[in-house]
Design a protein with these regions (language model features):
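Glycine- and hydrophobic-rich flexible loops that cap the catalytic core of alpha/beta enzyme folds
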Residues: 1-144
């Protein structure tokens, strides 16, 4: 599959985005989430400085376009799940097959709960305008 760039929001909205069974559990901690949110904040500042053509590459996501029609995340699972949690908080109507994914591993379940709670707490300290800037950045600035 050829390489291409996409906004993170567009990628997360793909109906067939999936995590293969062989992937390791979701292990990102609050510290990783804090670093991610800080990176996005810096990208927002840069976007305000350089204008609407500015894009920030949040990292590489490797996806396998499977014969069964699914887009399996091969690399970048931790980052993309974390960003999906941010989207879910900022936009409660947000739907992604990824956020509907059933995680059977107890470590994954606990880290997802803990990280969502951290995201919620982090954003309670932010203004509504800042929350909107974050959501806009995920749609327009942040790409993979």
């Amino acid at each position: 599959m050829p390489a291409y760039k996409s906004s993170i929001f567009d990628l997360l909205n793909k109906d067939n985005l999936a995590i293969p069974d062989y992937q390791r559990p979701y292990k990102w901690t609050k510290r990783n989430i804090e670093d991610l949110l800080t990176d996005i904040s810096k990208a927002i500042e840069e976007g305000q400085k350089f204008g609407e053509s500015y894009k920030y590459r949040i990292g590489t996501i490797l996806i396998h376009n499977s014969q069964d029609g699914n887009l399996y995340i091969v690399d970048g699972q931790q980052r993309i799940i974390s960003i999906a949690l941010v989207c879910l908080y900022l936009l409660p109507s947000f739907h992604s097959d990824l956020t509907d994914h059933y995680f059977s591993d107890d470590v994954s379940k606990q880290n997802i709960r803990d990280n969502y709670m951290f995201i919620r707490q982090w954003f309670t300290l932010q203004s509504d305008d800042e929350k909107k800037r974050f959501l806009d950045a995920l749609k327009d600035i942040i790409e993979v």
